[in-house]
Amino acid sequence: MTGTTLAATYGPISGADLEAELAQPRIADGDAQDAAVYERDGGAHAPPDGDRADVRRAAGAGDASVRLTRVSKRYGERAVLADVDLSIGRGSFVSIVGRSGCGKSTLLRLVAELETPSAGTLVKRGDGGGALDTRIMYQEARLLPWKTVLQNVMLGLGRRAKDDARAVLDEVGLLARANDWPAQLSGGQRQRVALARALVHRPQLLLLDEPLGALDALTRIEMHALIERLWREHRFTALLVTHDVQEAVALADRVLLIEAGRIAFDQRVPLDRPRARASAAFAALEDRVLQRVLTGSDAAPAAPNAAGPEGASRGRAAPASGLRWAV
């Protein structure tokens, strides 16, 4: 059976990934070739096995730091990002919003080092200036369908990591499904497994590329609470790309808007956690960000104490409850 045939059967895993998996030599421990498939897509430059334990220990002692200086990205003649300057504080949660094609996911891929800048510099520093373990979650869970839930979480770690994998499955509420197949899970449960697979490595930086975009509204809210709880417990740095402005405000300390390849808006979110979505302060801040995305101007009233002096009202905006998506 070819990788193309398997891709048609199993969907989210691309044909190229499966071809790579099938081309690997079969050895006693099948985790090695499966891990190669995972590391290329979701491992985002994971360290070699021998270094992984040291990185996990460092992650427990410090947080991630990312700095971009005049970073640009071009594909041929088309400029996607232009002169981006961005500093992401250690342990912070940053959301990126913007219209389709503005460069959000390209920026995330640059931070993941899945692509390289055309110009400028990108620096990632772990604790004490050491290596920075980075993991990435996509909209598709990208689970290997021939592996159980537990085996998917253990990819790249070997059988000695079973206790760690079971512990993180317990954290995401899926320990009872450890021996099930991915096909037996709902979409939200598959994303929980993908989250567990990232967190078992104890990353210092977690990149989220619209991971909840395909889920229903109630499941999204449950996942928001889970991601926030785990972020607060593990204190990794999080960078989220999303089309959903409400999601961005609910999760982040800071919301960035990308327009025409540049950071056009940088909004702090000083609301208490957990966020009360029905509160006037939350609604006003969400509305301000959304109006900035839609109109290109800061027309909405700011939440009290949320935006500083620049948040003064300059016009009447549509209710935030009626508009959420920046597409």
UniProtKB/Swiss-Prot annotation:
It catalyses: ATP + H2O + aliphatic sulfonate-[sulfonate-binding protein]Side 1 = ADP + phosphate + aliphatic sulfonateSide 2 + [sulfonate-binding protein]Side 1. Residues 37-54 have a biased composition (Basic and acidic residues). The keyword Transport applies. One of its GO terms (molecular function) is ATP hydrolysis activity. One of its GO terms (cellular component) is plasma membrane. Coiled coil: none annotated. Keywords: ATP-binding, Cell inner membrane, Cell membrane, Membrane, Nucleotide-binding, Translocase, Transport. It is found in: Cell inner membrane. It holds the Pfam family ABC_tran. It is a peripheral membrane protein. Residues 66-285 form the ABC transporter domain. Its EC number is 7.6.2.14. ATP binds at G98, R99, S100, G101, C102, G103, K104, S105. Residues 21-54, 300-327 are annotated as: Disordered. InterPro entries: AAA+_ATPase, ABC_transporter-like_ATP-bd, ABC_transporter-like_CS, ABC_transporter_ATP-bind, P-loop_NTPase. The complex is composed of two ATP-binding proteins (SsuB), two transmembrane proteins (SsuC) and a solute-binding protein (SsuA). Belongs to the ABC transporter superfamily. Aliphatic sulfonates importer (TC 3.A.1.17.2) family. Part of the ABC transporter complex SsuABC involved in aliphatic sulfonates import. Responsible for energy coupling to the transport system. This is Aliphatic sulfonates import ATP-binding protein SsuB. The gene is ssuB.
